[in-house]
C-alpha cells in the first residue's frame, strides 16, 4: 500500500511497496545504504525474504530460496551440495556480493564467486536482496547486486524440527533464543543435514568414463550469539558460527592417478560489535574474523595426501558505519578495512600472500517535494592495484499520487582475487573489472496490484579471463547486458499472488555471442492460500533457453539448452498451536532438465517435515 511516512520514522520518503515476500511497505532494511530505513524508501529494486517465507516454501537450501527471486538465475552441477553459481541480471557469478550479517562472505579459491550450496539454510533467518550496482556502498563485487543473509532471530523461543525425503534426505535442527534478565539474550542453534544424493552426471552428455555412484552431501552446523543492551541507546553483541560439510561429486578416471571426488569444507566466523542508536545519530563498529579450509581429495588416500588440493583463506574485517538524520532524509559515512590471507601451499597459491583494502564511503538520501534523491560515493585503496573510486545516483519522481518514475546510474567493480593474482596461473598485473549501469523504472499501485517495471543496461569492461596459450589470467573481455524486469503482487479473495518476468540479453561485447549459462527469459509465480487450516503453496518457474559448453569434446563445443517449466506443491497443517507438519513435492511433473550441461537435476522429490515450538 502506498502512503506518506514521516521523516523521523521513515526518512520522509513516499512509501512504495516493491516486489517482496514481506509486502509491508514499512518493513525495515539495512542493506541498501548500510543504515536502517523502510524498504519503500529504497529506489533500487529490493526484495525481503523472512524465515516465515522459507518455512512456507519448505526450502532445504539457500539456492532454493534465491531461485524464486526476480533477476536471479541459479546453475548447479547436480543436487544438494554440488557446485553452484548465482547470476543476477546476466552478470557473472563473481559479480554478486554475498554478505552474512553485513560482513563479506569469505571466499576461498580462484573463482571469486559465492557457492551458496555450502551455506546452511538453518542459519538463514532473513534475506535482503538488492539488484543493481552497489560498489559505491560496499566496494568490490557488487556489480549485479547484493545478497545479505541475516542470521539474527527476531523472537525468543525454542524450536525443534526434523525432516525426511527422497534420496535418503534427513535433517534435524534445534534452536533457541532466551532472555537472561531484562537486557541480555542468548541464541543457540545446532543443525544436521544429510542426503545420499544421486548420480549427477548425465552420461549421454559427458562420455562413458564418468564415475557411477551416488553424490551425497553432509552438513553439520553450530551457531551462538550473545546480545546485551547497556542502555536504551548503547548495545553490543558477540556471535560465532561454523559448519563442517562433505560433498561427494563425480570425477573422471585416469589410470594410475588418485580419483579426487570428495570435497571437505570447514568454515568458521566470529563477529563482535558495538552499536549506538540515538534519536538522530546511529553508529556501529563491527570486527570480524573468518577462516575457511576447502579440501578436494581421494578418500582412499585422505585429504592430507600430496594428491589432495587445499584452498585456505583467512579474512579479517573492521567496519565503522554512521548515519545522521538531516532535513528530510539522512547522510551516512563510514570506513571499511579488510585483510585476506592465504596459507602457503594451497591448491592455487604456492606461497602465502595477503591483500589489504581500506574503503571510505558517503551515502545520502533526501526528499524534496515529490522528488526523492539518493547517492553514494566510495574510494577504495587496495594493496595490489591502488586506489579505485565508484559512485552512483538515483532520483525518484512521484508524478501522480501512487505512481513513481525512477532513474539511476552507477559504477561498480570487481577486484581480482588472490588466486587470480598469485596462483599457479596468476597474473599480478591484473586490473579490476569495471561496470557502468543505467536503469529506468515505473512503479505504482493500480486496482490493488503493486507493480514495477524496469529496463536496464550494464556495460562491463576489463573482464578477467584465462588464456590457454599463455596459461595466465588477463584483462580483455567486455560484456553488454540489456534487460527488462517486471514484478507484481496482489490478492484475489483468499489467494495471494506474486509474479515476476525477466528478459536478459547478456552478450560478449566483442564477439556478440550470448554469455553462457544465463536463461534469456524467466517467469516466476507464487500462489499461496489457506483452506480449512491447511496452508497451500504452488510455485511455478519457467527457465528459458540458455547456452553452455560441452567440455567432453575438443575443441569445446557450444550447446543450446532448451527451456523448462517447473512446478512445486507445498502444504502445511498446524496440528496444535505448537506442532506443525509440512509436506512438499518439488518438480511435480518430474521434468528432465539441466542448468549446467552434462549434470542432471534430481527429478521429482518428496519431503515431509515437522516442527515443535515452545
Swiss-Prot record:
A motif (TonB box) lies at residues 26-33. Its main location: membrane. Cyanocob(III)alamin binds at residues 83, 85, 92, 110-111, 251, 309, 517, 551. GO terms for cellular component: cell outer membrane; pore complex. Ca(2+) 1 binds at residues 199, 211, 213, 215, 250. It is found in: Cell outer membrane. SUPFAM superfamilies: Porins (SSF56935). Ca(2+) 2 binds at residues 213, 215, 249-250, 261. GO terms for biological process: monoatomic ion transport. It is a multi-pass membrane protein. Disulfide bonds: none annotated. Residues 1-20 form the signal peptide. Belongs to the TonB-dependent receptor family. BtuB (TC 1.B.14.3.1) subfamily. NCBIfam families: PRK10641.1, TonB-B12. PANTHER family: COLICIN I RECEPTOR-RELATED (PTHR30069:SF53), TONB-DEPENDENT OUTER MEMBRANE RECEPTOR (PTHR30069). This is Vitamin B12 transporter BtuB.
Amino acid at each position: 500500500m502506498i502512503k506518506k511516512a514521516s521523516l523521523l520514522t521513515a526518512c520522509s520518503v513516499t512509501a512504495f511497496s516493491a516486489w517482496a515476500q514481506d509486502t509491508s511497505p514499512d518493513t525495515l532494511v539495512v542493506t541498501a545504504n548500510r543504515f536502517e530505513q523502510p524498504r519503500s524508501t529504497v529506489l533500487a529494486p529490493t526484495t525481503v525474504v523472512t524465515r516465515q517465507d522459507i518455512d512456507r516454501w519448505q526450502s532445504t537450501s539457500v539456492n532454493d530460496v534465491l531461485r524464486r527471486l526476480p533477476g536471479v538465475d541459479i546453475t548447479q552441477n547436480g543436487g544438494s551440495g554440488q557446485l553452484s553459481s548465482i547470476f543476477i541480471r546476466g552478470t557473472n557469478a563473481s559479480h554478486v556480493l554475498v554478505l552474512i550479517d553485513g560482513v563479506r562472505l569469505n571466499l576461498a579459491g580462484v573463482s571469486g564467486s559465492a557457492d551458496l550450496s555450502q551455506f546452511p539454510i538453518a542459519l538463514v533467518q532473513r534475506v535482503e536482496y538488492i539488484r543493481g550496482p552497489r560498489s559505491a556502498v560496499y566496494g568490490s563485487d557488487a556489480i549485479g547486486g547484493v545478497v545479505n543473509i541475516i542470521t539474527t532471530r527476531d523472537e525468543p523461543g525454542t524450536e525443534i524440527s526434523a525432516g525426511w525425503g527422497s534420496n535418503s534426505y534427513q535433517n534435524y535442527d534445534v534452536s533457541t533464543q532466551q532472555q537472561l534478565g531484562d537486557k541480555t539474550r542468548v541464541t543457540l542453534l545446532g543443525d544436521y543435514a544429510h542426503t545420499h544424493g544421486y548420480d549427477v552426471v548425465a552420461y549421454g552428455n559427458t562420455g562413458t568414463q564418468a564415475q557411477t555412484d551416488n553424490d551425497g552431501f553432509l552438513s553439520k552446523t553450530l551457531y551462538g550469539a550473545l546480545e546485551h543492551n547497556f542502555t536504551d541507546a548503547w548495545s553490543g553483541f558477540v556471535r560465532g558460527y561454523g559448519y563442517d560439510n562433505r560433498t561427494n561429486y563425480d570425477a573422471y578416471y585416469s589410470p594410475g592417478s588418485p580419483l579426487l571426488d570428495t570435497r571437505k569444507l570447514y568454515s568458521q566466523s566470529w563477529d563482535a560489535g558495538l552499536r549506538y542508536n540515538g534519536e538522530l545519530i546511529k553508529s556501529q563498529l563491527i570486527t570480524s574474523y573468518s577462516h575457511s579450509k576447502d579440501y578436494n581429495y581421494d578418500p582412499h588416500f585422505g585429504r592430507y595426501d600430496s594428491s589432495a588440493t587445499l584452498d585456505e583463506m583467512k579474512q579479517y574485517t573492521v567496519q565503522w558505519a554512521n548515519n545522521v538524520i538531516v532535513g528530510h532524509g539522512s547522510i551516512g559515512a563510514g570506513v571499511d578495512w579488510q585483510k585476506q590471507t592465504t596459507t602457503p601451499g594451497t591448491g592455487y597459491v604456492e606461497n602465502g600472500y595477503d591483500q589489504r583494502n581500506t574503503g571510505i564511503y558517503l551515502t545520502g538520501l533526501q526528499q524534496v517535494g515529490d522528488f526523492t534523491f539518493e547517492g553514494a560515493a566510495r574510494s577504495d585503496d587496495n594493496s595490489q592495484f591502488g586506489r579505485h573510486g565508484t559512485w552512483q545516483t538515483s532520483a525518484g519522481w512521484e508524478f501522480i499520487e501512487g505512481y513513481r518514475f525512477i532513474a539511476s546510474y552507477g559504477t561498480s567493480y570487481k577486484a581480482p582475487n588472490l588466486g587470480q593474482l598469485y596462483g599457479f596461473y596468476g597474473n599480478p598485473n591484473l586490473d579490476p573489472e569495471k561496470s557502468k549501469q543505467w536503469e529506468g523504472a515505473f512503479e505504482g499501485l493500480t486496482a490493488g496490484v503493486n507493480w514495477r517495471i524496469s529496463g536496464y543496461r550494464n556495460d562491463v569492461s576489463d573482464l578477467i579471463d584465462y588464456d590457454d596459450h599463455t596459461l595466465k589470467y588477463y584483462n580483455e573481455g567486455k560484456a553488454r547486458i540489456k534487460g527488462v524486469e517486471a514484478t507484481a503482487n496482489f490478492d484475489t479473495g483468499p489467494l495471494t499472488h506474486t509474479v515476476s518476468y525477466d528478459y536478459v540479453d547478456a552478450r560478449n561485447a566483442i564477439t556478440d555471442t550470448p554469455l553462457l549459462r544465463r536463461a534469456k527469459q524467466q517467469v516466476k509465480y507464487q500462489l499461496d492460500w489457506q483452506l480449512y487450516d491447511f496452508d497451500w503453496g504452488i510455485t511455478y518457474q519457467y527457465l528459458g533457453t540458455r547456452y553452455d559448453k560441452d567440455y567432453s569434446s575438443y575443441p569445446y563445443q557450444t550447446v543450446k539448452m532448451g527451456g523448462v517449466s517447473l512446478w512445486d506443491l507445498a502444504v502445511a497443517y498446524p496440528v496444535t498451536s505448537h506442532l506443525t507438519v509440512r509436506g512438499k513435492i518439488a518438480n511435480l511433473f518430474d521434468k528432465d532438465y539441466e542448468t549446467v550441461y552434462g549434470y542432471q537435476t534430481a527429478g521429482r522429490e518428496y519431503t515431509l517435515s515437522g516442527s515443535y515450538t515452545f
